[in-house]
Amino acid sequence: MRFSVFLPAIAALSSAVAAQRSCGSIPHKAFSNELKEAMENSRTSSFSNVTSNVTINTYFHVITDGNTGKISDETLQKQIAVLNSDYKASGFSFKLVASDSVDNPTWAAGEDDMGMKSALRKGGYDTLNVYFVPMLREGLLGFCYFPMKNPSEGQKIKDGCVINSNSVPGGSAQNYNEGKTTTHEVGHFMGLYHVFNEQEGNCQQDGDMIEDTPVQGSASSGCPTGKDSCPQQGVDSIHNYMDYSYDSCLTEFSPGQIKRMQMLWQFRAGSGSGSVTRPRPKPPVLMDYEHRL
């Protein structure tokens, strides 16, 4: 069942341009603690070996509401190519094992995240699942879950990245339609923070705890050459995939970020490659969108 009053609204939202990148990835406190422990242990022989040259099995799930949100196979191939190009220097590559398309108005509206993933997720904790959704709350371009050392079954199911389908190569999200949103969100999947401090103007802390990304007090927009938001040495990392610059401006991960990803891959590899145990999904809950508009 669909609510006709909702369809024009979602169609309008799906074609709206993104004024500024907005990411909904928030690290769990447990991840922050585990990261600090891993950084400390990295100085010992038991943690000296970092992972490199890993191929990550990847599944794309395209969520639609009728014609809204449809993505061609050609575009999905372009998206995986962008991902592989951007991560080439890291030693990680992504193999698109399969893709599927599901018509579900509830999921297309960014609702029932757990139900969607319970029904569609494939592979183990070391598998990347990407869900392309045409409308996300609060204008988000995407969000993704950070790796956990000992994830619960529920955390394994919720794992993966949800991406605004308008941000794929050739999409309608102006300035954010070269596929770099997926690159950015997968950075969180690999254990990376934003290069900027989440508290606007905070220059007292190194937000991502990586030495070769200068302290940055604000997210970037556009491609502001020479931007320097903090007095410490080094200008802002406007070309870094973990900033908020336009897609055309994003070109790199730092060596320190690459080392961080390689170090934290053990969180995912250590949790096994077997399929996640999924609960029986509940029928989608159809909200009364007439009262939301």
From Swiss-Prot:
Q: Which UniProt keywords apply?
A: Disulfide bond, Glycoprotein, Hydrolase, Metal-binding, Metalloprotease, Protease, Secreted, Signal, Virulence, Zinc
Q: Which residues are glycosylated?
A: N49, N53
Q: What class of enzyme is it?
A: hydrolase
Q: Where in the cell is it found?
A: Secreted
State the residue spans of region: Disordered: 270-293
Which residues make up the binding site for Zn(2+)? H184, H188
- Chief location bin: secreted
Keyword Glycoprotein recorded: yes
Which cysteine-cysteine pairs are annotated as disulfide bonds in the entry? C223-C249
- The EC number of this protein is 3.4.24.-
What are the recorded Gene Ontology BP terms? Answer: proteolysis
GO CC annotation: extracellular region
Q: Where is the signal peptide?
A: 1-19
* Superkingdom of origin: Eukaryota
Record function comment: Secreted metalloproteinase that allows assimilation of proteinaceous substrates. Plays a pivotal role as a pathogenicity determinant during infections and contributes to the ability of the pathogen to persist within the mammalian host.
Q: Which family does it belong to?
A: Belongs to the peptidase M43B family.
The protein in question is named Extracellular metalloprotease MGYG_00389
List the source organism: Arthroderma gypseum (strain ATCC MYA-4604 / CBS 118893)
